[in-house]
């Protein structure tokens, strides 16, 4: 289902000013990605406090939220994921970046699929927003208006609620 979300990371101060590049070999749990997109991904120079990508499919807590908690458990794996840019889906065994389907190129004039950067904490711009901060996943959206511990929420709510 096209329940859209955003995925954000509170950037470590030590990473500001550094340049990162998506690396398929650093994906957790034997995940792969749409190979058509890898050569289109550019470098990401971190200049602000938060990185955010758009995620198109299954953005609800028991969809992408569950994937984030179960597969993207540490800062470096999340940073690598976000350096891959906007995604159609990270659920399942294959990550499909947005540019794989749209043919978008990363260059100096087009940043449409690169992670967005901000100095302010992300707000909800889609149905759900996810944030990795202080070693934990948080979310807000339809069910909750304030940042809520995602793992605790998943442990206490079924996907049928």
Task: Identify the residue ranges that each predicted region occupies.
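Intrinsic-disorder/low-complexity loop/linker signature
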Residues: 16, 26, 35, 42-43, ...
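Short beta-strand scaffold segments in enzyme catalytic cores
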Residues: 4-9
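Short, solvent-exposed aromatic-acidic interface loops
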Residues: 21-63
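Low-complexity intrinsically disordered segments
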Residues: 67-161
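Tryptophan-centered short beta-strand motifs
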Residues: 17, 48-50, 137
């Amino acid at each position: 289902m096209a329940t859209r979300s955003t995925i954000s990371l509170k950037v470590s101060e030590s990473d500001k000013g550094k340049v990162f590049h998506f690396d398929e070999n650093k994906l957790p749990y034997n995940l792969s990605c749409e190979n058509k997109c890898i050569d289109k991904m550019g470098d990401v120079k971190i200049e602000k406090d938060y990185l955010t990508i758009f995620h198109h499919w299954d953005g609800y807590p028991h969809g992408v939220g569950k994937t984030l908690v179960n597969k993207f458990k540490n800062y470096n794996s999340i940073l690598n994921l976000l350096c891959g840019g906007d995604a159609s889906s990270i659920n399942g065994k294959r990550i499909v970046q947005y540019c794989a389907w749209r043919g978008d190129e990363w260059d100096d004039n087009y940043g449409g699929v690169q992670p967005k950067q901000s100095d302010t904490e992300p707000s909800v711009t889609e149905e759900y927003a996810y944030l990795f901060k202080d070693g934990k996943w948080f979310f807000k959206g339809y069910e909750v208006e304030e940042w809520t511990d995602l793992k605790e929420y998943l442990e206490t709510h079924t996907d049928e609620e």
